[in-house]
Structures are given as structure tokens and as C-alpha cells.
Regions:
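Residues lining hydrophobic/aromatic ligand-binding pockets adjacent to catalytic sites
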Residues: 1-224
């Protein structure tokens, strides 16, 4: 069985979903430390001014050493209203804005205590939208070993996985020798996003899946 492991990501780019679609099981790594400036609570959409960050505010005071699954969302910032305005301005002319607006309204109307819960909710939504049937689960809440490679090995062994589809950035830290010694074959997921029609000028890759969802009816995973 081949698995993939990734931290939660708010409205992730298409490559996040592509990696999930190519494995037998996906594990969301939410019991590790929250990283400032990551994609856990933000991503980019395309506006008339180019790529633009939209962010879910979180309460980090007193939580900087806490796990992602423990970091609360800051609902005092009225972020749902801000996102609604940003999405309206960016995508009101998009091909699928009309048919997708109600789903967005329903999703944004749900309340979540933590950023991990929010990311889980959105992940379930995107998997259904794009007919990706890969089962997924949250990571174990405790580790018996330190180190990134060792943690990955432990998760693989817990799931009896003999294959691991790694993200390209894991080349910087993944110990391939330890993985091989543990009987886990490693592949790297080098993803090239599809080019699709966008508003506001030349194509910009690497945006949130929201951009592709709004601009095209194409499902690259159903058609691959």
C-alpha cells in the first residue's frame, strides 16, 4: 500500500489533491507544530492585481508551541466576510461563479474551533467535488520516535504501508537510506499543474484549488 502524508492546508493548490489521488491512503499530519507563514491557514487567489493571499486568522499568543490541531481560529476578525468580498471581487465573472456560490456560502457558514478542523472540512469538500475517493485519516496523536523521517516511518508501519509518495520539498530532509532499510519504497511527487482559463491576464500556476474550481469544469483526476 502506498500512502502520502501532509500537514493541513487551507484551500490547497491542485498538487495537494493530486498527491492524494495517486495513493491508497492519505494521512493529515495535524499533530505537529504550527508554522507561521505556511499554507496551513492561507493560500492565494488571482485578482486583477495578480496573486493575492487570503488568510484565516488564528490565535497564536500562547499557542506558538502547540500542535496544529490545537491552534484556534480567531473569529473576532470577521474573516468569513472578508473572504466573501475577496472571492466576489476576484471571481464574479468566472465561468462557474454562479453555480458554485451556494456551496461556498454553506461551507463558509460552518463554524470551526481550530484551523485543523477547518482544513479537514474543506479537504472533505474538495475530495467530493473532484470525485477523489482515496480514504484518509488523521495522524496518531503521539510519536514514539523523534525526527521527520522516523515519524514518517512510524506512520507507514502503523498503516502497513510499503510505499510512500513524498512531496518534492521532502528531498531536503527525508533519509532515503532509513526508508529503504524499513522496507518503504519512496517516490517523489513532482507535479506540474494543468493550464486552464483564468481571469485577469496570463496564467498564474500554484494558486488555491478555488481558482481552478471557479474557472473551469475540467476534472483532471476524473480524466487522468
Amino acid at each position: 500500500m502506498k500512502i502520502a502524508i501532509n500537514q493541513p492546508a487551507f484551500m490547497p493548490w491542485p498538487g495537494y489533491l493530486d498527491r492524494i489521488a495517486r495513493v491508497d491512503h492519505f494521512v493529515m499530519m495535524d499533530a505537529v507544530q504550527f508554522e507561521r507563514g505556511s499554507f496551513i491557514n492561507r493560500n492565494r487567489i488571482k485578482t486583477q492585481h495578480g496573486a493575492h493571499w487570503f488568510t484565516v486568522p488564528v490565535k497564536l499568543k500562547g499557542h506558538t508551541q502547540n500542535r496544529i490541531c490545537d491552534v484556534p481560529i480567531d473569529d473576532t476578525r470577521r474573516w468569513q466576510e472578508n473572504h466573501a468580498k475577496q472571492i466576489l471581487h476576484a471571481y464574479s465573472r468566472a465561468l462557474r461563479f454562479g453555480e458554485n456560490s451556494k456551496a461556498l456560502e454553506l461551507m463558509y457558514g460552518c463554524k470551526h474551533e481550530t484551523i485543523a478542523h477547518l482544513c479537514c472540512h474543506w479537504l472533505s469538500f474538495w475530495l467530493v467535488e473532484y470525485a477523489i475517493t482515496t480514504p484518509w485519516s488523521l495522524m496518531p496523536r503521539t510519536f514514539t520516535v523523534p525526527g521527520k523521517t522516523e515519524q514518517i516511518i512510524e506512520i507507514c508501519q502503523a498503516l502497513k504501508a510499503d510505499g510512500y509518495l513524498a512531496g518534492p520539498l521532502s528531498r531536503d530532509y527525508l533519509d532515503l537510506g532509513k526508508m529503504e532499510k524499513s522496507g518503504i519504497a519512496v517516490e517523489f511527487h513532482d507535479y506540474t499543474p494543468p493550464v486552464y482559463p483564468q481571469l485577469w491576464g496570463p496564467f498564474i500556476p500554484g494558486l488555491s484549488i478555488l481558482d481552478m474550481w471557479m474557472n473551469t469544469e475540467t476534472n483532471p483526476w476524473r480524466e487522468s
